[in-house]
Amino acid sequence: MKFVDEALIKVEAGKGGNGCLSFRREKFIPRGGPDGGDGGDGGSIYFEASSDLNTLIDFRYTRQYKAENGQSGMGGNCTGKKGEDLTIKVPVGTMVYDADTGELLADISQPGVPMLIAQGGFHGLGNTRYKSSVNRSPRQTTPGSPGESRNLRLELRVLADVGLLGLPNAGKSTLIRAVSSSKAKVADYPFTTLHPGLGVVRVSPYKSFVMADIPGLIEGAAQGAGLGHRFLKHLSRTCVLLHVIDIAPLDGSDPVADAKAILNELTQYNPDLLNKPRWLVLNKIDMLPDAKEREEKIQSIIKGLEWKDKVFSISAIESKGTQELCYALMQLIDEMKKSEA
């Protein structure tokens, strides 16, 4: 299925039903009093997260959503039927913005919890409501009020504990395939990953975390170059970021310069991302079979980046060092979630 993480739609809640103008008409009662009933409230529009969805593609084809209008009141003091509410299902992690004002209306991160987005119109009042000691035959009614109408911008941000960062072909997709059940596409050319992929990493029968494979960044991604600009936003919900670096790139590029390019893009896009825990993952150590040469390369990268946080040397394709990485990630995620509780 095609991955779509942005959509523009219009929602319109139902109009309230009008109040009824009616008088009691029965045999032998020529001047019956008012008996016009109230209208029904208009239906409201709710958004609710569903774990079964992972893309906003449905909103590319259906862009207008309207709840049911309330029924008008009737004689005999009968109240009109309330308009049926409309519940729109979206993927977990969807953010709902007012497209006209930019206001964040809802951050839908919990499945099964409906969130009100557009309030239905209030019902109109029938003429029975206006009967008084000085006005026994009121002809006054009120119409139902219109429901809220909004232009919405939907933005999906994947919910993951760990985000993988790196230039194209750094080996992110290979890593996520090695440690999870994800079937991310892997090939020897840039931009194999065209949308964020999620993999569940299970370190024990009762412990697991979610890893997100973010499409490869290139220099200028924060300004929209390559694929990174659209997907940097998905990093905002992660607990920890992994900088995945190809320790021995075939094109002869400098791994230190590659890592600095990624850091620069993060800084330009959102400096707050740099406050997250960030670990360095040096991938493809299998390309340097000589232990001394490999260790010298690792130390030169750490020194060149002035890296102070954790460093892991792995071979994703051979699953070397990946288990230690996953256990360390699980421990960090558990500690962070306990501190937030």
From Swiss-Prot:
CDD domains: Obg. Pfam families: GTP1_OBG, MMR_HSR1. Mg(2+) binds at S173, T193. Transmembrane segments: none annotated. GO terms for cellular component: cytoplasm. GTP binds at residues 166-173, 191-195, 213-216, 283-286, 315-317. Its cofactor is Mg(2+). GO terms for biological process: ribosome biogenesis. InterPro entries: G_OBG, GTP-bd, GTP-bd_Obg/CgtA, GTP1-OBG_CS, GTP1_OBG_dom, GTP1_OBG_dom_sf, OBG_GTPase, P-loop_NTPase. Gene3D superfamilies: GTP1/OBG domain, P-loop containing nucleotide triphosphate hydrolases. Keywords: Cytoplasm, GTP-binding, Hydrolase, Magnesium, Metal-binding, Nucleotide-binding. It is found in: Cytoplasm. Its EC number is 3.6.5.-. Residues 160-334 form the OBG-type G domain. One of its GO terms (molecular function) is GTPase activity. Residues 1-159 form the Obg domain. Residues 129-144 have a biased composition (Polar residues). Residues 128-150 are annotated as: Disordered. Belongs to the TRAFAC class OBG-HflX-like GTPase superfamily. OBG GTPase family. An essential GTPase which binds GTP, GDP and possibly (p)ppGpp with moderate affinity, with high nucleotide exchange rates and a fairly low GTP hydrolysis rate. Plays a role in control of the cell cycle, stress response, ribosome biogenesis and in those bacteria that undergo differentiation, in morphogenesis control. Monomer. This is GTPase Obg. It comes from Legionella pneumophila (strain Lens).
